[in-house]
């Protein structure tokens, strides 16, 4: 038997579920056994991106002791657009405070 953690986060809540599974267990089986799909019905496992220790991994991947399985949410905004928006907000803040920019 091996010990793993299933992790998922929303903007409001972070969940880590410790789980003990057989050494032959795959990632998809562990996620289903954890009960996280019942806690977060918005997770569509067939379309979800998953990883182990911050590295993208296939659903049929094998597991090792102390693995942390992470279920990632889809991006809500293009990363380039998000950075541009943050830069514009920063420029406006500097202008309001009277800083050069």
Curated annotation (Swiss-Prot):
HAMAP family: UPF0125_RnfH (MF_00460). InterPro entries: Mopterin_synth/thiamin_S_b (IPR016155), RnfH (IPR005346), RnfH_sf (IPR037021). NCBIfam families: PRK01777.1. Belongs to the UPF0125 (RnfH) family. PANTHER family: UPF0125 PROTEIN RATB. It comes from the Bacteria. This is Protein RnfH. The lineage of its organism: Bacteria, Pseudomonadati, Pseudomonadota, Gammaproteobacteria, Legionellales.
């Amino acid at each position: 038997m091996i010990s793993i953690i299933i992790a998922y986060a929303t903007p409001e809540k972070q969940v880590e579920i410790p789980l003990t599974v057989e050494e032959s267990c795959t990632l998809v089986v562990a996620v289903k056994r954890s009960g996280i799909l019942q806690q977060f019905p918005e997770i569509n496992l067939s379309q979800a991106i998953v990883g182990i220790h911050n590295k993208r991994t296939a659903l049929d991947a094998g597991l090792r002791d102390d693995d942390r399985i992470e279920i990632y949410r889809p991006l809500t905004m293009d990363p380039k657009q998000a950075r541009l928006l943050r830069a514009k907000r920063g420029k406006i803040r500097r202008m309001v405070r009277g800083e050069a920019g």
